[in-house]
Amino acid sequence: MKVAVLGAAGGIGQALALLLKTQLPSGSELSLYDIAPVTPGVAVDLSHIPTAVKIKGFSGENARPALEGADVVLISAGVARKPGMDRSDLFNVNAGIVKNLVQQIAETCPKACVGIITNPVNTTVAIAAEVLKKAGVYDKNKLFGVTTLDIIRSNTFVAELKGKSPSDIEVPVIGGHSGVTILPLLSQIPGVSFSEQEVADLTKRIQNAGTEVVEAKAGGGSATLSMGQAAARFGLSLVRALQGEKGVVECAYVEGDGEHARFFSQPLLLGKNGIEERQSIGKLSAFEQQAMEGMLDTLKKDITLGEEFVSK
C-alpha cells in the first residue's frame, strides 16, 4: 500500500507524515511531496524512525514522481489561515494549488483514493471533482473531503463537558467543513444527553474551534497538529478498508445522492474500492434539522464557487 502526502513540508503535512510513518502497516510505502526544497530532508529525518514503512521525499514543481503507484493521496498543500481570515479567504491561493495537484493525480495515479485537507474544503473538493471529471477519471467513491477534525473536536469537547473518556465518544458530524456548515449530531450519541443551551453552545464551539486555534497561535498559524492527527486517522482507516478490513466507518465530505447538496459530509462505510456505502444521517433533532436547512445555501454557494473555478 502506497500513501502520498502532498504538502508534506507544512505544519499539517509534517505531523501527518510522522503519524503515518509510525502507524502505517508494515511493508507500506510513504511518499512525501512539497514544493519546498526541505522535503527530501523531512523524509530522511523520518526514515530514522524504526518502523517497516519505506519513505521517500520529493520537492520542486513536479509531484508526479511522488504519485507513481499511489493507492491513497492526501493533499494538505496550501496557505494557512491568519487571524481575521475565514476559510474562504484562502480560496484565491489554495484553489489553484489543488487544481494543479489534482491534474497531476489524474495523469499519474487516476485510480487512487484522494483525501483533500486543503481549505476551504467545501470548495476545494468540488474543484478536485471537476478536474478529475474533465480528465475522464472521476470516481465519486474515491474522492473525500477530510472533515475528521470536526469529529475529533466534537469527541473531545463532549467528553470534557460530560466527564467521559474521549475514546468512548463518537459524534457523527454532517454538512460541510466551515462555520455554520459544520453540524455535529449531538442527539445521536448513545447514553449522553444535553440541555438545549448545551447543544447550542457546543455546536457553536465545534463550528468555531478552528478560529479558537488561529487566535491562540496569535498569527503563527492555524490548527496543524490536531489536523495532522485527524488526517492520519482518516488515512489509516482508508488503508485498512482498502486492505479488506470490514466495518470501517468514517464521516467525510463526498458526492452523494444530492439530496441536501452535491457534496455533503456523512457517515461512510469504507471498502476495497473507497466508499462502499453512504450511510443514512439518521433522525435529526429539531435543532439539527433547522441548522441543516439553514446551512444549505452557504454550502451550495461554496460548491458552485469550486465548479465555476474549473469551468472558467
UniProtKB/Swiss-Prot annotation:
PROSITE patterns: MDH. Keywords: NAD, Oxidoreductase, Tricarboxylic acid cycle. Substrate binds at residues 81, 87, 119, 153. Its EC number is 1.1.1.37. NAD(+) binds at residues 7-13, 34, 94, 117-119, 227. GO terms for molecular function: L-malate dehydrogenase (NAD+) activity. GO terms for cellular component: cytoplasm. GO terms for biological process: malate metabolic process; tricarboxylic acid cycle. SUPFAM superfamilies: LDH C-terminal domain-like, NAD(P)-binding Rossmann-fold domains. The keyword Lyase does not apply. Coiled coil: none annotated. The active site is at residue 177. It comes from the Bacteria. It is an enzyme of class 1 (oxidoreductase). It catalyses: (S)-malate + NAD(+) = oxaloacetate + NADH + H(+). The keyword NAD applies. PANTHER family: MALATE AND LACTATE DEHYDROGENASE, MALATE DEHYDROGENASE, MITOCHONDRIAL. Catalyzes the reversible oxidation of malate to oxaloacetate. Homodimer. This is Malate dehydrogenase. It comes from Enterobacter sp. (strain 638). The lineage of its organism: Bacteria, Pseudomonadati, Pseudomonadota, Gammaproteobacteria, Enterobacterales. The gene is mdh.
